[in-house]
Structures are given as structure tokens and as C-alpha cells.
A protein has these predicted regions:
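A generic local structural motif
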Residues: 4-7, 29-30, 102-103
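Short low-complexity stretches enriched in small and charged residues
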Residues: 1, 25-33, 68-75, 129-130
Length: 130
């Protein structure tokens, strides 16, 4: 497993929302939530398996996260073990507890859409989003 550096993890912990662009649909970014649990980066589709960005990523397609003036190339792996899914759920509820949508992120139909993100190797991180 490849993971993000400490600065990237800190920035992702602090940011409330990120934009995600899949390589299949590079012209349209979707705003999503991201959490860090045990230094692993997780995302989840509140629309369940219907979310287009989720379908693109779960099919193995690459994507880019945009946040805090950065472009971060990522790839996704299904979070298949129940312990990781539970850790991610706790973090979604903790981080987004003030949002009325937080409970939607831990519904039974959204849990299978939990993805663990990793940096795409050999891709430079761009600090200028514009």
C-alpha cells in the first residue's frame, strides 16, 4: 500500500470538501467529502453506486483531487474489510457531525462505496489549481 505524505494527510484532514475529476470525465468536477482514518484516505458516494465519479473510480479509472490550491492525482481501491469501513464511517460522522447529511454517509447502501485513495505513482503533485 502506498500512502500520502504527512503534509497531504494534514491538509486532507483540515479541508471540508474536495473536488474530484475522473479521467473519464475530466471537464466536470464533483464536490465530495474525504476523511482520514489511521492515515488512510477514504471517500464514499452518498448516492451509493449511482454516483458517476464512484463508478469511474471503482472501474479502475484514475482521478484527481482538487483542494487547498492543489491537484492530487489518485487511484482508488475498494475498502473491502469491515474494520476499514467502520473506521471511515466513524470519521465521516466525526468530521461532518454539523452537517445534516452526515447520517447519509453511513447508510447501509453507501457503505459498499467506501474507497481507499492512494497517490498515483510517477505523477507530480501540482500545487496550483486554476
Amino acid at each position: 500500500m502506498t500512502n500520502f505524505d504527512a503534509d497531504t494527510l494534514r491538509e486532507l484532514r483540515d479541508v471540508q470538501e474536495v473536488a474530484i475529476r475522473t479521467e473519464k470525465h475530466p471537464k466536470s468536477a464533483v464536490v465530495i467529502w474525504v476523511v482520514i482514518a489511521d492515515d488512510e484516505v477514504f471517500v464514499r458516494s452518498w448516492r451509493g453506486a449511482k454516483g458517476r465519479w464512484y463508478r469511474d473510480l471503482s472501474a479502475g479509472g484514475p482521478a484527481t483531487l482538487e483542494f487547498a490550491g492543489r491537484r492530487l492525482p489518485v487511484r482508488a481501491l475498494p475498502a473491502s474489510d469491515q474494520a476499514a469501513i467502520a473506521r471511515a464511517s466513524r470519521e465521516f460522522l466525526r468530521k461532518y457531525q454539523r452537517s445534516s447529511h452526515a447520517q447519509e454517509m453511513v447508510r447501509s447502501e453507501t457503505l459498499p462505496t467506501t474507497l481507499r485513495l492512494e497517490p498515483r505513482s510517477g505523477i507530480r503533485f501540482d500545487r496550483t489549481v486554476g
